[in-house]
């Protein structure tokens, strides 16, 4: 957790395994605090937007990218954007294409907010990134549950085959979770068990945000 007692904006980092429930928690907190803060004062940024640009590579090399390894992320740009937002400056967030396996020519314009929710699997693995965060959260969902959710999602939403999802899980998703993501749980201020429907944990996170904002 950041040591700043009066942050210019509050940055919440929600990490955990792929399909652990990070996006559900982020969207739930966002939706429920919109009514209190005004939707223009709270926003979500996905770590996925900061995968490195691979336009200089051919498709054969792009598809070999290990998206579960910290080296796949453009950490420098993400940290630069967080610093800019904290100083009151807007940023243009890259738009990443999973079809082309690289950034598109489009960007998402993002204005400074009172509360920014970051969500992504690798957020707590980088010390410099953790230093920019007000509250760090780890969603601690059993890995077998995450795999089932990921399998269903990737086959339904991304048109992938059962074999390709299982192969990716075996080769990169599970090993990278054990090597990088699970150890990063030690840096979390809040650990949320049972995934995105843990109502008590969500209420605790909202209460912490209110406290940092000076609201009761």
Swiss-Prot record:
It comes from the Bacteria. ATP binds at residues 16-23. GO terms for molecular function: ATP binding; cytidine kinase activity; uridine kinase activity. GO terms for cellular component: cytoplasm. It is found in: Cytoplasm. It catalyses: uridine + ATP = UMP + ADP + H(+); cytidine + ATP = CMP + ADP + H(+). Transmembrane segments: none annotated. Pathway: Pyrimidine metabolism; CTP biosynthesis via salvage pathway; CTP from cytidine: step 1/3; Pyrimidine metabolism; UMP biosynthesis via salvage pathway; UMP from uridine: step 1/1. It holds the Pfam family PRK. GO terms for biological process: CTP salvage; UMP salvage. CDD domains: UMPK (cd02023). It is an enzyme of class 2 (transferase). Keywords: ATP-binding, Cytoplasm, Kinase, Nucleotide-binding, Transferase. InterPro entries: P-loop_NTPase (IPR027417), PRK/URK (IPR006083), Uridine_kinase (IPR026008), Uridine_kinase-like (IPR000764). The keyword Kinase applies. Its EC number is 2.7.1.48. PANTHER family: URIDINE KINASE. Belongs to the uridine kinase family. This is Uridine kinase. The lineage of its organism: Bacteria, Pseudomonadati, Pseudomonadota, Gammaproteobacteria, Pasteurellales.
């Amino acid at each position: 957790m950041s040591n700043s007692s009066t942050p210019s904006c509050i940055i919440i980092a929600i990490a955990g395994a792929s399909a652990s429930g990070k996006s559900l928690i982020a969207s739930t907190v966002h939706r429920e605090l919109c009514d209190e803060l005004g939707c223009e004062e709270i926003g979500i940024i996905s770590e996925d937007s900061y995968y490195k640009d691979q336009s200089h590579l051919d498709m054969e090399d792009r598809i070999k990218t290990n998206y579960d390894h910290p080296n796949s992320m453009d950490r420098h740009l993400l940290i630069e954007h967080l610093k800019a937002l904290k100083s009151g400056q807007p940023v243009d967030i890259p738009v990443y294409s999973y079809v082309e396996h690289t950034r598109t020519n489009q960007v998402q314009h993002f204005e400074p907010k009172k509360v920014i929710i970051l969500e992504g699997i690798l957020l707590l693995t980088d010390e410099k990134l953790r230093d920019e965060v007000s509250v760090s959260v780890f969603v601690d969902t059993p890995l077998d549950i995450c795999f089932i959710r990921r399998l269903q999602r990737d086959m339904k939403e991304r048109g992938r085959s059962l074999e390709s999802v299982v192969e990716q899980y075996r080769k990169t998703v599970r090993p990278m979770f054990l090597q990088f993501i699970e150890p990063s749980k030690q840096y979390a201020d809040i650990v949320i068990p049972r995934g995105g429907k843990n109502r008590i944990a969500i209420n605790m996170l909202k209460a912490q945000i209110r406290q940092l904002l000076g609201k009761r």
